Amino acid sequence: MAKEKYDRSKPHVNIGTIGHVDHGKTTLTAAITTVLARRLPTSVNQPKDYASIDAAPEERERGITINTAHVEYETEKRHYAHIDAPGHADYVKNMITGAAQMDGAILVVASTDGPMPQTREHILLSRQVGVKHLIVFMNKVDLVDDEELLELVEMEIRDLLSEYDFPGDDLPVIQGSALKALEGDEKYEDIIMELMSTVDEYIPEPERDTDKPLLLPVEDVFSITGRGTVASGRIDRGTVRVNDEVEIVGIKEDIQKAVVTGVEMFRKQLDEGLAGDNVGVLLRGVQRDEIERGQVLAKPGSINPHTRFKGEVYILSKEEGGRHTPFFNNYRPQFYFRTTDVTGSIELPAGTEMVMPGDNVTIEVELIHPIAVEQGTTFSIREGGRTVGSGIVSEIEA
């Protein structure tokens, strides 16, 4: 069969497998690639075996070492990038650093065990970092003879998901066996195809970066005599056009409004700048000293300056170049947001005495001056210019 060209017109979606250790996340990932390669042979659909996925290369994301396997495959409708983090610690780091932005995930639960401690932790983390759509794959059903037991496990999983504000009663639960599908058992291969069509239907297509409201972290500011003030940086999301009204947010309590009178890239005038572009934006009615690095240009009303938030953080281990000693309540490091460091104090959860290097923990942060943040904003925790932790904003408090 002739291999067709990679079709860019298919929507692209990022997903991953999550769940307790040894419940079959990697086996399921292998089964999906293998069954799709058999049933829908294309140049993209290549079978990956367990060993090649499990031997995930080490990556460094914001100074943190993470093992993650990236595989790709496609269904009739979509192209998928799928991440599988082999170890529990890798999964936690992946979620918190934003190394793996997932639009949705497949929660793998072994029917022989039911939900386990990491099942719970992964569901909580998904909720905290904004993975809104989960599908459940109950694995290893071939090892359970008792139909009632499977029903009990399914109820238990649904209750657990509801506890963390997922639609536990309504979200899809598919029962199958990744290993049997991998071995070529047709009944279980059909279930993998059913799982993939469920993923196609249930996980919505992500909003493209260019469709989101403008956010441009300011890296540099200069003035052009006779023309005004230019703020430059890389557009994080959205678009910016001449005559757009924008807001300058962060560092100061007040939000300042401005009008865009020019957009330049590589010294050329543009009609518009798009997400990913490095641009200079000429602003009318803004003095050189009224805007600075660390602020953002944003679509009016889309983001506000805040000083207090809850965050989910991972603290680097000594081996990763992090701290050698624990820290305690009221620890005051710098928080690096996009382009700038801001000092802040950390309040630990009740009952947590200290945080050791290599731990992950929920913290409350109070910054000394406001920064444009929202749920899902990532940050680094630094001490004297070196990264000692990585986090993501889970809730805005003030």
From Swiss-Prot:
Gene3D superfamilies: P-loop containing nucleotide triphosphate hydrolases, Translation factors. Mg(2+) binds at T26. The gene is tuf. Residues 10-207 form the tr-type G domain. Its EC number is 3.6.5.3. GO terms for molecular function: GTP binding; GTPase activity; translation elongation factor activity. Monomer. Residues 84-87 are annotated as: G3. Residues 177-179 are annotated as: G5. Residues 19-26 are annotated as: G1. It is found in: Cytoplasm. The lineage of its organism: Bacteria, Bacillati, Bacillota, Bacilli, Lactobacillales. GTP binds at residues 19-26, 84-88, 139-142. It catalyses: GTP + H2O = GDP + phosphate + H(+). This is Elongation factor Tu. It is an enzyme of class 3 (hydrolase).
